[in-house]
A protein has these predicted regions:
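Loop-centered beta-sheet repeat module
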Residues: 70-111
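Hydrophobic, lipid-facing positions within transmembrane beta-strands of outer-membrane proteins
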Residues: 3-5, 56-60, 93-97, 123-127, ...
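Outer membrane beta-barrel
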Residues: 1-79, 100-102
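Asparagine-biased alpha-helical interface segments
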Residues: 128-132
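Outer-envelope beta-barrel architecture signal
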Residues: 13-15, 58, 66-70, 95, ...
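Transmembrane beta-strands of outer-membrane beta-barrel pores
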Residues: 21-25, 76-80, 103-105, 112-116, ...
């Protein structure tokens, strides 16, 4: 069974655009995390909400290579499978942006998302980073950290955080960011 259809394409040398049904608006984000796990709870690296990924949403994303290790991305997800429609007051719409920096052994990213429903607007911010040793297979682990804060307009502040120490003996196991 087909669970989603998407299309990603370049627009020049520095811009990539993606669009699709059942497509995460954060698909072209460069979240700074070296861990990739089998469960969403572990591999979201502490930014489960700011790195928006609604199921069954129509999505659009774009990434921009700024240069010198910097990248920016924007994304949108909308409730397109119901009568509520895209970008309506009744529908659920999420939009976000990310600024990231990556170097050979470390990276950082700042992610923003706004979830807009018919009753609540919730803003999330996520900050992530990682460092990997120059040589893998040593006793020194890779380190990934993440912190997220959410502020629903009708409740108190919501936070999540993440720390992982990963010891990898084969460099081919590292997630390409």
């Amino acid at each position: 069974a087909v669970d989603g259809i998407s299309y990603t394409f370049p627009m020049g040398e520095k811009i990539t655009v993606g669009v699709g049904n059942d497509y995460a608006g954060s698909s072209l984000y460069s979240t700074a995390c070296v861990y990739g796990g089998p469960t969403k709870g572990l591999d979201d690296c502490g930014n489960a909400m700011s790195a928006m990924d609604a199921s069954e949403a129509t999505g659009l994303s774009a990434s921009f290579d700024i240069g010198n290790g910097f990248a920016a991305a924007v994304g949108y997800e909308g409730e397109g499978d119901t009568a509520s429609g895209l970008m309506t007051k009744e529908g659920t719409d999420t939009y976000g942006a990310q600024l990231s920096y990556s170097a050979d052994q470390y990276a950082a990213s700042l992610t923003y998302a706004n979830y807009d429903t018919s009753t609540t607007d919730t803003t999330y911010w996520g900050l992530n980073g990682y460092w990997t040793p120059a040589e893998t297979g040593t006793a020194v682990p890779s380190i990934s950290v993440g912190y997220e804060v959410g502020n629903p307009d009708n409740t108190s502040v919501d936070t999540s955080h993440y720390l992982s120490l990963i010891h990898i003996s084969e460099p081919t196991r590292l997630q390409d960011i």
